[in-house]
């Protein structure tokens, strides 16, 4: 069913922002409430006690035994009856699946197709290259490896399963330990400092906004830094994201970051045939020469935005009021509804 047909059946005065209770869900419902919209969380039974403690932010819950139940007809019907707009995030994509979201009958805020590209490491890097964004060298097979590399799995896994290697044999052993996955890439490991840039593209305001940035706090690689070299030697680093740290970039670097964001939005529309709407993230390493090298993107809200529930230094420059990424999503939805332009932001 097309979004146009679904919206004809909706009571737009009771439009409801809905998402899966994980990742950035609390920020999303908090932002929706700030913009006067109704809220709904799909929550696993074993998580209900925690999320129900925020019942002042959530108008209704749909309780499920497993995330795959999100695709069930009874859940879909309840969402449609609630006039729901789904806001996808990393857990939504990982647990439900980008393919499942592609044909989902409930309106989704933002682009559906970008979630498919995000889940495929090779397509992801192709999009970045086509956008003219500087990316690390990529190796087509373990045999080509001739220096330090990072091997990365596809999907929104929060860095789980990533590993470092220096030789073809180390890459093969690492892949074998992971069950020889098919969706992976081998990238040059760029030396520098990480920085992850949060963007929001708005069709309603016709502009790209930088809404914040962060650094990921990863286990065990960040813990290894506390050990003396003689003790850390021989311990294999891993990159499972457990939290986020705020960062403000040198203002001169923002110019290149903004150019990358603009190019990403333009290229996404050219390749996917639909406009990118709402939050996305470019994930980078900045070298000692000040070069921004982008190694990943996320085509939806990222968990790093949870740092800025009361707004970031950058979002305040646009709005002069507290504006989280979750509230920014809700404002775009509300403004689109009030101006009769919902079809421009929903897919």
Swiss-Prot record:
EC numbers: 6.3.4.23
Pfam families found in the cross-reference section: DUF1246, DUF1297
Annotated GO MF terms: ATP binding; ligase activity, forming carbon-nitrogen bonds; magnesium ion binding
Reaction catalysis annotation: 5-amino-1-(5-phospho-beta-D-ribosyl)imidazole-4-carboxamide + formate + ATP = 5-formamido-1-(5-phospho-D-ribosyl)imidazole-4-carboxamide + ADP + phosphate
Domain ATP-grasp stretches: 112-323
One GO-annotated biological process of the protein: 'de novo' IMP biosynthetic process
Keywords: ATP-binding, Ligase, Magnesium, Manganese, Metal-binding, Nucleotide-binding, Purine biosynthesis
Protein name as catalogued: 5-formaminoimidazole-4-carboxamide-1-(beta)-D-ribofuranosyl 5'-monophosphate synthetase
Organism of provenance: Ignicoccus hospitalis (strain KIN4/I / DSM 18386 / JCM 14125)
Lineage summary: Archaea, Thermoproteota, Thermoprotei, Desulfurococcales, Desulfurococcaceae
């Amino acid at each position: 069913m097309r979004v146009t047909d679904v919206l004809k059946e909706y009571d737009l005065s009771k439009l409801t922002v809905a998402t899966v209770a994980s990742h950035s869900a609390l920020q999303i419902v908090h932002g929706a409430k700030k913009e006067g919209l109704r809220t709904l969380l799909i929550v696993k039974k074993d998580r209900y006690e925690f999320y129900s403690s925020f019942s002042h932010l959530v108008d209704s819950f749909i309780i499920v035994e497993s995330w795959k139940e999100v695709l069930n007809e009874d859940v879909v019907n309840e969402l449609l009856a609630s006039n729901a707009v789904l806001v996808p995030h990393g857990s939504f994509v990982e647990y439900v699946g980008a393919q499942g979201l592609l044909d989902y009958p409930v309106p989704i805020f933002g682009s559906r197709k970008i979630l498919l590209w995000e889940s495929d490491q090779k397509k992801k890097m192709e999009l970045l290259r086509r956008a003219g964004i500087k990316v690390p060298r990529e190796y087509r097979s373990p045999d080509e490896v001739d220096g330090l590399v990072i091997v990365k799995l596809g999907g929104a896994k929060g860095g789980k399963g990533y590993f470092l290697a220096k030789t073809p044999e180390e890459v093969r052993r690492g892949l074998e330990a992971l069950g020889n996955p098919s969706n992976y890439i081998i990238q040059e490991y760029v030396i520098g400092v990480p920085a992850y840039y949060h963007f929001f593209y708005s069709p309603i305001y016709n502009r790209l906004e930088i809404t914040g940035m962060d650094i990921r706090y990863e286990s065990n690689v960040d813990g290894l830094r506390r050990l003396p070299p003689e003790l850390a030697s021989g311990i294999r680093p891993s990159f499972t994201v457990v939290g986020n740290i705020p960062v403000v970039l040198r203002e001169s670097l923002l110019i290149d970051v903004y150019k990358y964001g603009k190019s990403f939005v333009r290229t996404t529309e050219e390749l996917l045939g639909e406009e990118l709407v709402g939050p996305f993230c470019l994930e980078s390493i900045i070298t000692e020469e000040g070069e921004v090298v982008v190694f990943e993107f996320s085509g939806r809200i990222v968990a790093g935005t949870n740092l800025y529930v009361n707004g970031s230094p950058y979002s305040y420059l646009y709005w002069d009021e507290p504006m989280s990424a979750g509230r920014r999503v809700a404002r775009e939805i509300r403004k689109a509804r009030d101006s009769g332009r919902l079809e421009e932001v929903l897919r």
